[in-house]
Amino acid sequence: MRLITHNMLSCNIKGVTSGFPLRIEAGNVIEKEVDFNPDFIRHMFAKIEWKALVEGARSMGYAELPEESPDAAVLKSDEPFLKKLHHALLELHLEEGALVCPETGRKFPVNKGIPNMLLHEDEV
């Protein structure tokens, strides 16, 4: 599971009001090379919840992103930053581990890179 995917997931258990961001418990993280596309990264930047991305990247062992979200000027001119963002969003893969609901503590397993977000009957 890539961090770009993680950034779009939330806990949908009935009654949960703050199910985002899911905390990552990383078991096995791998890197898979992906072609760099700066236009795609710039486009996706507006859709990303920055704090959740930074926390997710750090929990997967990647600490190259700044705490504060960069401004638009950085996105236009700073290619090294775009490459770091590209690496975090698209090249880091959580192969084994869990996603944890911040409100309930419910763990959703991640196996072979696929998060299992299915709910039990009593959670719907």
Swiss-Prot record:
Disruption phenotype: Semi-dwarf phenotype. Reduced organ growth due to inhibition of cell proliferation. GO terms for biological process: organ growth; regulation of cell cycle; regulation of cell population proliferation. InterPro entries: Trm112 (IPR039127), Trm112-like (IPR005651). GO terms for molecular function: protein heterodimerization activity. Transmembrane segments: none annotated. Residues 2-120 form the TRM112 domain. It comes from the Eukaryota. SUPFAM superfamilies: Trm112p-like. Interacts with TRM9. Belongs to the TRM112 family. Acts as an activator of both rRNA/tRNA and protein methyltransferases. Required for TRM9 tRNA methyltransferase activity. Involved in the regulation of cell division progression during organ growth. Required for the expression of cell cycle-related genes, and the G2-M phase progression during organogenesis. PANTHER family: MULTIFUNCTIONAL METHYLTRANSFERASE SUBUNIT TRM112-LIKE PROTEIN (PTHR12773:SF0), UPF0315 PROTEIN-RELATED (PTHR12773). This is Multifunctional methyltransferase subunit TRM112 homolog A. It comes from Arabidopsis thaliana (Mouse-ear cress). The gene is TRM112A.
